Every structure is written in structure tokens, then in C-alpha cells.
Amino acid sequence: MSLCLWKQCLDRLQSELPSTEFSMWIRSLKAKLNNNILEIYAPNQFILDWVKDKYLIHFKKILQDFCGSNSPFIKFKVYQTSKEKKFKKNILQKIQNLNAKPIWDKIPIFKKSSHRSNINKKHSFENFIEGKSNQLARAAASQVAKNPGNSYNPLFLYGGTGLGKTHLLHAIGNGILAYKYNVKIIYMHSERFVQDMVKALQNNAIEKFKLYYRSVDALLIDDIQFFAHKERSQEEFFHTFNALLEGNQQIILTSDRYPKEINGVEDRLKSRFGWGLTVAIDPPELETRVAILIKKADENNIVLSDEVAFFIAKHLRSNVRELEGALNRVIVNANFTHRSITVEFVREALRDILALQEKLVTIANIQKTVAEYYKIKVADLLSRRRSRSVARPRQMAMAMAKELTNHSLPEIGDAFSGRDHTTVLHACRKIEQLRKENHDIKEDFSNLIRTLSV
């Protein structure tokens, strides 16, 4: 009975949550029903706390639907594998043995590693601005930093330029170093791996190359898509990847696209990229963009009003790097001219950027891009046809227009053959709902945002 009820809960959640979210937080849970108490077990405290905070309401509602007034009480616990129990038992035994004699002379002196990790200490989880667009990626990265080699291995982060992938890579590296002593971590761009391999081949030192890369505790590689069409590098990385995974050594990779969409990379590598957890980082939503601007201004000892932050965030939508660049320009101009940072001042300081944005993102451009993406005609979007193959892309285009332009709902409706503003509002709400429930719609939305923001 307990297994049947738990399976029903999982099936329901799987149908309601995006596949990435379900795989990341729910799939690893176990459960047992005893005396009308449903004990839900998580593999570690981090996942337990997250699930309890984010999904307890979901579980209660599902149980209410299935069991009515007889719904079981929910308890959360951390489960341990037999391997973990044995490990803890051995540790406790060693501690007991050590307590019987002085141990001060046996404490190891940890020395700073001689290798260069290339980890940038400025990038941490604390100064990474979290929002809906990057929440899962940050949570996964944090978990990997606390438990490298055992949580989500490999971790694959993907998304457009300037969205925070590199920041999270460095944050993971700093996090691991904060939790563990004397670990060997290497951060690098994929081109550095290629260069090192070529140099090793030229110097007849390939065995040293292999030993170096396979002896790390964590390997962090940025922009893995640059391995494309480099067969020898892919071959060597394939074997390095396998060796690290077998040794429970952590691998974290980033790319500007989903693993299966990386052209020029062998299928066996792309398959391995997806063995752990693959998480997208989307362009930041308006609230996150505002928070990023205010945080960055504060770091520069600048007080940025909500009105100004909102104005900049509303007009610059593509990525964090673009936001920071615009803010830096505003700050430099303000310092140089000794003027206050107002909306009018920002409009003047960023006039060329704002003009370019207005020129690039138009409703007509959105309609053309969406039509091409869904392989239909722009005329179909503007028609009165209501078949799903046309209606869903039309709703997506309307939602894009609201997200990426400053046009009002009536203006957007006019651009779609004079539709009423309530139709546009319904389309926007529908797409927002589907993005939460349907992984394909969420991916479509992210892909279109990236395309239109380039």
C-alpha cells in the first residue's frame, strides 16, 4: 500500500514539474508508510531542507487528493546507505582509539597545494544573485561544493553568454576549498586543455599530462563546446572523464548550449555529459535584473534608486554582463559630470545602447523569429486559425512581445491583427503557467529569448 501511494505521488509530481526539477530534487527520494505516517527520506540534509521548503505543500495536496481526510502525516528524514553507515562506524572507531592517547603530534599540517587552481576568489555563492532563472543551477552548484564527487557528477551547466556560468564554476571551486583541506582543484577554459594536450604530445609527455589531469579532486572546464571538431582532444578527454568518474572525482562543465545540441562533439561524450545533472541558466527575469543592478551599485558605493534600476533592467534583458557594462558606464559618466543618477541621466548616458535595443527587438522581429522556430508562416500567427500548431506559437509570440518590448498589451494585440488586450493577457498567463508545468515549453521560451537577445 505504501509503495503504491508513494508511486502515485511520484507520478503526479513528475507530470506537474519540469523534468530537470523532478530529476534534481524528487527522483532520489525514498518513502515508507507506517502507522499513517509517510516518512520521506532524502539522501542528504541539503536536499531534505530544499524539498521540505519547496515541495511540502505539493505533497500535502497530492495526499489529500488521494486519501481525503485520511491523509497520512508527513515526516522528512535523511537516509544513509550501508556504505555511508560503514564509513561513519569506522570514523567513530578511529576517534575512540585516538582518545586513549595524546594526539597533538599526529595532527597533519596542511600545506598550500603547489598547483595553480586558477579559481577566482571574487566569485562566491554569497555574491551570486539568485532568481527564478538560475535557482536550480545555484542550488545544484552549492550541493556539489558541499559534497564533491557524490552529488550530481558530472554537473553540466548551460546557457547563453554572460548569464553566470563561469561565476558558478568559481563559486563551486571556492566552496570546495572552504569545506575541504588540501584538495586539488583545476579551473580552466576548454581551449587550455587542448593547448596542454598539444604541448604534451610535442614534448613526448602525454603520460605526465594524463597523470596531472586524472589526479585532481575536481575538474572545472568552461565552454566545453570548443572541443568541437578536435578529435584528438575529445579522445583524451573521454578517457580522462572516465578515469575521474571511476575515482569519484568531481567534474563540472559549462556550455552555451544543451549537450545534445553541441555539434562536432562525439555522441559518446555528449552522452556522458548527461550522466549526472544537466541544468539550464536562463536570461534573468526583471526582478533578478533589478536586484543585480542594485547589488553591483552597492559594491561601488553607489545608491541606485529602484526607479533607475527598473528602467535599466526593463531595457537591457539579454545577460548579466550587459547589465554590469551599462551600469559601469552610468557610474563613470556620473562621476565625471558630477550629476545625480536619475532616469533622464541614464537615458542620456545609455542612449546608443537603448536605441540599439529598440531597433533590434521589435514585435515584427519576434513574430518572424517565432514563426521560423515553429516552422510556420508569420501569416499563420496573424490569422484567426485556432489549431494548437498555430495557437501555441501565437501565444508564445505575444508573451515574447510583452517580455522583450515596451509595448502595451493593446499595442501588442494590434500587431496581431487587432486582437483585444485581454487575449494578449491570457496568452502571457498561459505561457507563464506552461513554463512551470511543461519542460518543452520552458525550453522553447528560453531558446527564443536567447535568439532574440543576441
UniProtKB/Swiss-Prot annotation:
Example of a GO biological process term: DNA replication initiation
Stated role: Plays an essential role in the initiation and regulation of chromosomal replication. ATP-DnaA binds to the origin of replication (oriC) to initiate formation of the DNA replication initiation complex once per cell cycle. Binds the DnaA box (a 9 base pair repeat at the origin) and separates the double-stranded (ds)DNA. Forms a right-handed helical filament on oriC DNA; dsDNA binds to the exterior of the filament while single-stranded (ss)DNA is stabiized in the filament's interior.
Q: Which Pfam families match?
A: Bac_DnaA, Bac_DnaA_C, DnaA_N
The protein's name in its UniProt record? Chromosomal replication initiator protein DnaA
**The organism's place on the tree of life at top rank:** Bacteria
Source taxonomy? Bacteria, Pseudomonadati, Pseudomonadota, Gammaproteobacteria, Enterobacterales
Gene Ontology CC entries for this record: cytoplasm; plasma membrane
Stretch list, region Domain IV, binds dsDNA: 335-454
Chief localization: cytoplasm
Q: Which residues bind ATP?
A: G162, G164, K165, T166
